[in-house]
Amino acid sequence: MPRRKKKVKEVSESRNLEKKDVETTSSVSVKRKRRLEDAFIVISDSDGEEPKEENGLQKTKTKQSNRAKCLAKRKIAQMTEEEQFALALKMSEQEAREVNSQEEEEEELLRKAIAESLNSCRPSDASATRSRPLATGPSSQSHQEKTTDSGLTEGIWQLVPPSLFKGSHISQGNEAEEREEPWDHTEKTEEEPVSGSSGSWDQSSQPVFENVNVKSFDRCTGHSAEHTQCGKPQESTGRGSAFLKAVQGSGDTSRHCLPTLADAKGLQDTGGTVNYFWGIPFCPDGVDPNQYTKVILCQLEVYQKSLKMAQRQLLNKKGFGEPVLPRPPSLIQNECGQGEQASEKNECISEDMGDEDKEERQESRASDWHSKTKDFQESSIKSLKEKLLLEEEPTTSHGQSSQGIVEETSEEGNSVPASQSVAALTSKRSLVLMPESSAEEITVCPETQLSSSETFDLEREVSPGSRDILDGVRIIMADKEVGNKEDAEKEVAISTFSSSNQVSCPLCDQCFPPTKIERHAMYCNGLMEEDTVLTRRQKEAKTKSDSGTAAQTSLDIDKNEKCYLCKSLVPFREYQCHVDSCLQLAKADQGDGPEGSGRACSTVEGKWQQRLKNPKEKGHSEGRLLSFLEQSEHKTSDADIKSSETGAFRVPSPGMEEAGCSREMQSSFTRRDLNESPVKSFVSISEATDCLVDFKKQVTVQPGSRTRTKAGRGRRRKF
């Protein structure tokens, strides 16, 4: 496709643009940029090729820039450190110059825009200032000054430093706006600027501006001078730049920063202005800043005083109360003793009361004590009944004895005190249960405990003879409670813990009192002969294992095999054990012949039948570990018998030895089993004599073969 480039037209357009730029100086830089951009535009006939050409130009530009960067990097790499340092200094100087030049250009543009806005807004400002009065103090007179001189405004903006315009925002051409305020004069009609150090006034025609505002404010708050000055800004929403204003105060009064309606109307009309607040923040309109600061200071003082008062209250420490000690629920008389002590304290406070009042108090206290004991007795008996009913199991027989104790204590409520009945219940309950702090509830095996009939007989024998003793204990308790509380607790502990209240150690199966069982358990290393203490989980697992073994025995009854030595039927499980025992008996008793073997087999069969009759008794005697071992060994033995056709020798289990073999045979078999166990059947290489392979010759290898193999490996890895 043909392409045409119109450079002549572009040159003429650029000349026209330069003429227009001379007329409008504000848009020179923008139009120059446009002119430079237009110079690179290529016009073509086809519309579809324009984006492709633009993309090609961009690619070429990026390539050129990348090449230039690469060349610069190469040059920098070839330069020495001193040359690189000098180049960095030059670069930083250039950047600083560019930044400074940009700031200067922005300041010049701002000044020009402000001057143009002042020239455009001058007539409206003049009319507003003519119709607007200013409120002054009572002793001063308000004067108005019409600002019609344009040179004065230009001089004002020349005096304003450029730092005030840096934070201003320009938008939509309306960049800034300033209005001259009329000046309030006192009887002296001269305009005088404020000096920061003293309150004197210098006669001059220059007005006061915002750059002196902070100093004059600080001076006015410190001491009241005759003539002060304040710049009062106003709030208005919109965009624009800084709004500057100065107000000169009156003679005798303090300074007044009063807003005017005309200013607000003018601001709302023009819009696009941002007013900056100088001095106190959040000062409302129409309020004296001095009074406002005094209010803030007063609030701060009140706040500090309230803080100090609150901190003083925090320093007062509160006294600690009496310690709360744990008590067993069975000791009712301790509670009664505490009630008596509290009542005695109250009596000590009111010592001036008469004897009649004391007697009445004692009677009321006795009635309260009786009602408390009855209520506590009933509630404790009910709660213990519920707990015991929940905790008793069908396999144990101690639940009946506990219920019988509860019934007897309820019948003997008149003679026996409530503390003793509750103590008896807790003692029996401690036999049933271990302490509650344990994670699982551990129950005692019923074989080690007394039956229900024996407990009834013992209590019937003890109860009539021990009533007098219990009454004596109660009298001793009542006497000692007031004097010494600790001795009373010891007496109750001794009376409640009877000789039968002993806990058996689960390791060595020895009985100890509850106070010594913990110390003994810490150092006990003994092994228990029988599992007398079983948890609920252990009992459940034990019952499951017993039921499983019983089912297996019932299934295996039908599987009997004939022994060809003694010609008797032997169950399938114990066949191997029976054959081995018969062989040993035949070797040992060669003179007896088949008679001795027949006796041995008859004894074996009798013991096996006894084992089938009482599987539950065996389950009680054996522990959980033995039952699991028996199950696992039965399974492994069955698998071995099915797999082996030649009937190799099998290690018998301890349960099978108990049921099928005599004691003499057990001793011989245990020795044989230990010697011929699979663990000890393995022999080390050095001790192997009957082996077909000579391991010693295999171990010694020639060093040359090793080196060759290593070399071969290395060659293989290389390839």
Swiss-Prot record:
Residue numbers spanned by region UIM-linker: 97-103
InterPro entries in alphabetical order: Rad18_UBZ4, RAP80, RAP80_UIM, UIM_dom
Zinc finger (UBZ4-type): 502-529
Consequence recorded when altering K52A: Does not affect symoylation
Record annotation: effect of changing A88 to G/S: Impairs localization to DNA damages sites
Region entry Disordered, spans: 1-30, 43-68, 93-152, 164-205, 320-378, 391-422, 588-668
Result of altering C508A: Abolishes interaction with histone monoubiquitinated H2B without affecting the interaction with H2A
Renumbered residue ranges of the record's region Zinc-finger-like region: 505-582
Necessary for transcriptional repression, as annotated region: 1-101
CDD domains, per database record: AIR_RAP80-like
Stretches the record annotates as Necessary for interaction with NR6A1 C-terminus: 400-500
GO molecular function annotations of the record: DNA binding; histone binding; K63-linked polyubiquitin modification-dependent protein binding; ubiquitin-modified histone reader activity; zinc ion binding
Database matches in Pfam families: RAP80_UIM
Annotated spans, Necessary for interaction with NR6A1 N-terminus: 100-200
One GO CC annotation: nucleoplasm
Biased composition range(s): Low complexity: 195-205
Outcome of swapping K19A: Does not affect symoylation
Phenotypic consequence of A113 to G/S: Impairs ubiquitin-binding and localization to DNA damages sites
Name this polypeptide is given: BRCA1-A complex subunit RAP80
Organism: Homo sapiens (Human)
Gene: UIMC1
